[in-house]
């Protein structure tokens, strides 16, 4: 699991009763604020989040069978530096560097070496290569790749094919990661796992990147949803999704370092009802298996034809998504997308609806994610000591504001240090994280109302009652590493928040 570092040093803490944007205060009577020392976490450069997006493009965009050229190849050192300046420490080249459109290693080098050298000069923890020759093998395969009447007669034959493919780029300076694939269906998992393990054999030093479907009711990907007698369709769908993830892990050898998924929450109107349940399921599995959790998050405005699917995000939306991800223990975050995906089918990405325009000019979304990346890396020395344990959601009956998106989680988790939570309007998400080394609990308490619905701007008050042994909480607002302490009165903490705001509290 995550590397943990804890030391007791003198830090600046203050006893606060209010904070701009997120107000926290104790209620009633209690002990003096000076009687207990708050837990203290120090900066450590070895603790950090993983951030990435799709790389700057070659200026060629292919959408729905049509191709157009922006007039400039953006695979330059200047553009890679601008990408890194967001806070991205992993470079996902996707289809900007390709091996499927060349006939020789020499042609591959002629097309791509300059771009790869520029990326290497900037410096990234990982530079991820995709190989659409291998992706094509996976996309056409159901069942496994190895055996009688299969594509490869034995494991050695598969390894030889993979070795031939990766020989184009394996020894290029800076290239140290391979994109195994994206969103394999249930019937492709055996082949997906075989390729994953083959890469591990023929290129053992490579970081292997992969991504799974995020979303629950997807019969095309997972198979038919067939409820048992007395079981709801929703519960059957969640069970099938869990089976999909467990099967993927088994097919990949049973010991993988992380799960990665995408499930973009902010649809044209409202929040997707599968977002929190998907996070809950994956965070639970990561907890069981001792894995990290990575997530692609929403940074694009996307249409299907003329129909808006995912809305353009604002600063509050980005904060809403970030708090929700950190609350579930996510330690790697990718932005979908950077300028736009350079190869789409059936999807249209609005120019200016992502971090960059088609011409790679910055938008305000670039600034939002630059702020979030810096904030999270500063907070890493605190939150990356904690692992996800469980969650609950809360909503007001007959709310005039839609709260349906919080109702799909199990809500069976019992908090270690909280005895009661109440809200005065809307909906809230509370997640529990735990530091096994210090035995500290952390709670992420978030106003989960959609930030863009009518009437959502008013403050929501959440009252949290902690168990009797706790007299104080250490508070971090919106993942900002500027802690302050609050003395609990009658063991209660009142929090005023607008949508998307969250506090991370450690009771002591």
Regions found by a protein language model. Name each.
Residues 487-508:
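C-terminal beta-strand-rich structural cap/linker in extracellular carbohydrate-active enzymes
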Residues 136-139, 219-220, 282-316, 351, ...:
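Active-site clefts of carbohydrate-active enzymes
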Residues 316-374, 387-397:
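Aromatic/acidic polysaccharide-binding cleft in carbohydrate-active enzymes
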Residues 397-469:
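Carbohydrate-binding surface patches
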Residues 66-102, 111-127, 252-259:
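Catalytic domains of carbohydrate-active enzymes, especially glycoside hydrolases
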Residues 54, 129-131, 196-242, 288-304, ...:
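Aromatic-lined carbohydrate-recognition surfaces of secreted/lumenal glycan-active proteins
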Residues 160-191, 214, 244-268:
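Active-site groove signature of glycoside hydrolases
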Residues 34-94, 132-133:
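Boundary/entry segment of secreted carbohydrate-active catalytic domains
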């Amino acid at each position: 699991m995550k590397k943990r570092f804890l030391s007791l040093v003198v830090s600046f803490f203050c006893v606060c009763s209010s904070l701009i944007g997120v107000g926290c205060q104790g209620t009633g009577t209690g002990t003096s604020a000076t009687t207990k020392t708050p837990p203290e976490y120090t900066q450590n450069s070895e603790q950090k989040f993983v951030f990435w997006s799709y790389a700057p493009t070659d200026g060629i965009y292919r959408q729905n069978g049509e191709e157009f050229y922006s007039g400039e190849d953006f695979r330059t050192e200047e553009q890679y530096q601008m990408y890194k300046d967001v806070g991205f420490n992993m470079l996902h080249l996707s289809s900007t560097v390709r091996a499927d459109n060349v006939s020789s290693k020499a042609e591959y080098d002629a097309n791509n070496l300059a771009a790869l050298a520029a990326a290497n000069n900037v410096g990234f923890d990982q530079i991820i290569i995709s190989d659409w020759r291998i992706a094509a093998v996976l996309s056409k395969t159901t069942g496994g790749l190895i055996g009688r009447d299969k594509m490869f007669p034995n494991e050695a034959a598969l390894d030889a094919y993979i070795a031939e493919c990766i020989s184009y780029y394996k020894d290029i300076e800076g290239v140290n990661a391979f994109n195994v694939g994206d969103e394999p269906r249930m019937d492709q998992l055996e082949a997906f796992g075989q390729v994953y393990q083959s890469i591990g054999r023929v290129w053992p030093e490579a970081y292997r990147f992969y991504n799974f479907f995020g979303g629950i009711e997807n019969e095309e990907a997972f198979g038919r949803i067939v409820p048992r007698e007395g079981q709801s369709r929703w519960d059957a769908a969640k069970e099938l999704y869990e089976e999909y993830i467990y099967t993927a892990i088994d097919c990949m050898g049973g010991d993988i370092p992380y799960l990665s998924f995408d499930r973009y929450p902010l649809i044209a109107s409202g929040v997707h009802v599968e977002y929190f349940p998907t996070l809950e399921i994956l965070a639970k599995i990561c907890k069981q298996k001792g894995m990290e959790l990575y997530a692609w998050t929403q940074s694009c405005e996307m249409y299907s034809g003329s129909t808006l699917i995912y809305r353009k995000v604002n600063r509050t939306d980005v904060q809403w998504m970030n708090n929700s991800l950190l609350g579930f223990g996510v330690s790697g975050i990718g932005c979908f997308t950077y300028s736009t995906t350079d190869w789409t089918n059936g999807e249209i990405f609005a120019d200016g609806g992502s971090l960059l325009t088609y011409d790679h000019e910055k938008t305000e979304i670039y600034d939002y994610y630059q702020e979030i990346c810096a904030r999270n890396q500063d907070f890493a020395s605190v939150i990356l000591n904690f692992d996800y344990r469980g969650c609950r959601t809360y909503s007001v009956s007959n709310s005039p504001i839609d709260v349906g998106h919080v109702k799909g989680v199990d809500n069976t988790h019992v908090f270690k240090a909280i005895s009661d939570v109440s809200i005065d309007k809307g909906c809230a998400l509370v997640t529990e994280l735990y530091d096994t080394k210090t035995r500290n609990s952390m709670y992420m308490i978030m106003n989960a109302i959609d930030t863009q619905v009518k009437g959502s701007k008013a403050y929501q008050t959440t009252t949290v009652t902690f168990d009797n042994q706790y007299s104080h909480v250490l508070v971090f607002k919106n993942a900002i590493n500027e802690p302050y302490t609050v003395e609990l009165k009658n063991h209660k903490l009142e929090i005023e928040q607008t949508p998307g705001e969250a506090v991370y509290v450690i009771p002591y």
